[in-house]
Amino acid sequence: MATLRFTLLLLVFVVGIFFSFSSVSHVRATSEINLRIEPFSSPFATDLAKLQTQIGYKFNNINLLRRAMTHASFSQENNKALSIFGTHIIETAVSLQFLAKDIDISSKALGRLISEVSNVESSCALDGDRLGLGKIIRVSTKTDASNSAILCTGFRAIFGAIAIDAGTVDEAIKVFWKVHGARAGRLVSML
């Protein structure tokens, strides 16, 4: 009877040791496997990362940029409101820039400058196209993302998203002039 108890105890001990070694090696193997797995990144996420580099602004809340790059044809959570806000930011940027240079600028001249920058065909759609927004903006399958109005809406929405993300319009204005800056010289000559 004592040998039977000893044998059972020895068997339990050996089985316990076997399982503890096998679970340790399993954990070690699992850890090695987990270390090799890279986080999934969608093409859209990659495009958003590239866009942040292009505009020189890193979003704290990437969902704002996602929304800015989402057209109304794609989702109810879209860029319409951000675009309206972005339009006002762009108009403020132009007004601030040109009133600071010439406080006596006529309202007609200032209005013309604002119109030039806000014009869908000749300005914001070109800037949006230059940033490659036609390949980034999410639209329904029946919608052409390279359409000027869609590019312009996305371009404007970026600045609305930046202002919300930064908590200040100043940052959005700074990024706007950085992105649009090469074309700003042409506007100055319009004065």
Swiss-Prot record:
The keyword Signal applies. One of its GO terms (biological process) is RNA processing. Keywords: Developmental protein, Karyogamy, Signal. One of its GO terms (cellular component) is plant-type vacuole. Disruption phenotype: Failure of fusion of the polar nuclei during megagametogenesis. Residues 48-167 form the RNase III domain. Residues 1-29 form the signal peptide. Pfam families: Ribonucleas_3_3. GO terms for molecular function: ribonuclease III activity. Disulfide bonds: none annotated. It comes from the Eukaryota. Required for karyogamy during female gametophyte development, when the two polar nuclei fuse to form the diploid central cell nucleus. This is Protein NUCLEAR FUSION DEFECTIVE 2. It comes from Arabidopsis thaliana (Mouse-ear cress).
